[in-house]
């Protein structure tokens, strides 16, 4: 927000090569204001969904509000876009109009610049094969959650601009720790019973909840019962009934 972005920028050192900032919004113009402060060389739009939708008439208005960061990316800079997203073409056109280079990532869209080719289970872990530009690269990851794979693809798209990703260690994403409340797994004890808890309580919107349920479905539990505890989904405004 208007406090977090300046604080993050002030925390950067003149010796830092890169700065990574998250730009949030719940109304039109907020990303425009913040991205004008940042003047990013590279921008990333992960996806468009009904998060913080209370101040928008429809999801296209959300997509247009997110696109404000593209307009404020430096000329000849880069925008990283999800080719599987419904508004990919819209954002791509805006980038072209503003002389911004586009790098796409995806799982379903096989024309993506950075795309998932295959995923193979190896014991309790997974090997993902990624195609980026004209080469393939494999990485080991600890789970096959779709949102996690999308994040990896987006990160690789960013890194491919300045880094030779073929030289990355195959375990570079393996030990990534999920932030608390965003799908982290812990073991708790209630009434002397051990319970495996997957915590997704940080925030909720239709897409993140769908991802959480799909991820939970992948967790095998033959000996134990599985429960899904759902709380309120806020900031949807008139879209709540939908």
Regions found by a protein language model. Give the residues of each.
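Acidic, Mg2+-coordinating active-site environments of NTP-dependent enzymes
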Residues: 41-196, 221-224
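Switch II (G3) loop of P-loop NTPases
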Residues: 17-31, 197-203
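Active-site beta-alpha connecting loops in nucleotide-dependent enzymes
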Residues: 179, 201-242
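A short acidic, amphipathic alpha-helical/loop segment
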Residues: 30-33, 90-94, 211-215
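Short beta-strand-centered segment that lines the nucleotide-binding/catalytic pocket of NTP-utilizing
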Residues: 1-3, 23, 47
């Amino acid at each position: 927000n208007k406090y977090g972005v300046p604080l993050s920028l002030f925390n950067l050192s003149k010796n830092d090569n890169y700065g990574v900032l998250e730009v949030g919004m719940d109304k039109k113009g907020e990303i425009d204001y913040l991205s004008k402060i940042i003047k990013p060389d590279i921008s990333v739009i992960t996806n468009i969904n009904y998060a913080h939708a209370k101040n928008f008439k429809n999801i296209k208005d959300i997509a247009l509000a997110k696109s404000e960061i593209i307009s404020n990316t430096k000329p000849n800079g880069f925008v990283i876009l999800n080719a599987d997203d419904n508004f990919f073409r819209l954002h791509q056109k805006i980038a072209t109009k503003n002389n911004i280079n586009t790098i796409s990532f995806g799982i379903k869209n096989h024309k993506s610049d950075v795309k998932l080719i295959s995923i193979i289970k190896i014991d309790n872990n997974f090997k993902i094969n990624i195609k980026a530009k004209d080469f393939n690269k494999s990485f080991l990851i600890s789970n096959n959650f779709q949102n996690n794979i999308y994040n990896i693809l987006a990160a690789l798209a960013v890194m491919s601009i300045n880094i030779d990703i073929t030289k990355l260690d195959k375990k570079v994403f393996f030990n990534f720790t999920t932030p608390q409340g965003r799908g982290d797994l812990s073991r708790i004890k209630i009434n002397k019973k051990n319970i495996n808890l997957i915590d997704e309580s940080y925030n909720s919107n239709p897409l993140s909840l769908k991802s959480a349920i799909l991820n939970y479905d992948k967790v095998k539990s033959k000996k134990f019962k599985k429960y899904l505890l759902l709380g309120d989904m806020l900031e949807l405004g008139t879209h709540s009934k939908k």
